[in-house]
From Swiss-Prot:
Binding site for Fe cation: H115, H119, D311
Protein name: tRNA N6-adenosine threonylcarbamoyltransferase
One Pfam family of this chain: TsaD
Cofactor binding note of this UniProt entry: Binds 1 Fe(2+) ion per subunit.
Gene of this entry: tsaD
Main location class: cytoplasm
Lineage, uppermost ranks: Bacteria, Bacillati, Cyanobacteriota, Cyanophyceae, Synechococcales
Role, per record: Required for the formation of a threonylcarbamoyl group on adenosine at position 37 (t(6)A37) in tRNAs that read codons beginning with adenine. Is involved in the transfer of the threonylcarbamoyl moiety of threonylcarbamoyl-AMP (TC-AMP) to the N6 group of A37, together with TsaE and TsaB. TsaD likely plays a direct catalytic role in this reaction.
Amino acid sequence: MRKVLAIETSCDETSVSIVSNIGDNFKIHSNIIASQIEDHAKWGGVVPELAARKHLELLPFVLEKALAESEIKIEEIDYIASTVAPGLAGCLRVGSITARSLCMLHSKPFLGIHHLEGHLSSILFSENYPKKSFLTLLVSGGHTELIKVDDRRRMQRLGKSFDDAAGEAFDKVGRLLGLSYPGGPAIEKIAKNGDPMKFNLPKCKISDKKGGFLKYDFSFSGLKTAVLRLVERINLDGKDVPIPDIAASFERVVAEVLVERTIKCAKDHRLENVVLVGGVAANNTLRKMMINEASKKSIKVHLAPLNLCTDNAAMIGAAALFRIKFKDHLSSLKLGVAGRLSIEQANTLYEENPPF
């Protein structure tokens, strides 16, 4: 049994987890998450400098609690991993420096993990996760991507958002409607009392320079603007803004766009399994719609556990364990952090000469 201590500090969650695996069975011994939502709520979004300072403040206590809850001593840990890219650079440094310091102090090997690979790996804690090639819809506050993953975990991005990520659109529309931060849960809650067919909002597409549209790519800024114009028009008419109906209509359109393009991509690439991960993957409308529409095309949907959809260190540990399983190179202790790094570049984190 290999045991990994993992650290996640890429944005506004401070998390430490102890995970292990025996073959294809992955186990969480502890997964402590300290959220900063209340600290950033009054600003309507994450403030990078504030987030980094909170990580510095919280990480020692989160680390101590994770070890205590797991009942595993740090001397019994086999590997230490942390998120190193992409994310907020100041936040990433807190976790990375802590992890590498622990490695030097306790003579442990280090793995720097790509944050999106971590989200992909959250599915390893679900029952009957796909062992063969599959398509992942990774949908969160900072990313909306379609990623093909083969049985060796080699990753290829097939689609992406050209502007706002879906989660970012939820936050912005939530703020526009006067809802609390984060916008995703707030919109989902109030949308339950609304009519999802009340308003005909646009499903925006990205033009292809060769003609037509890019089949697997996303754009949510136009949808956000359409909601803004709708609210302005209702206000000009002197009417009350039907917030539940607007929220429900917005939620429906986002889900439809994500589901339609995911299933199209899976069918075109002859992939029989779709994996849904990331913070927005916790949205019940999206989960139900994906399962219902995929079943019509004989595609099986695998959902990340609800408690592992948002940022957490368990998924980072799972990614590390999978790397170790296939004997990928360990990361250099000289490896730094990067605010941006595509998923196709994840393997560079294990090269002898670090990319940053």
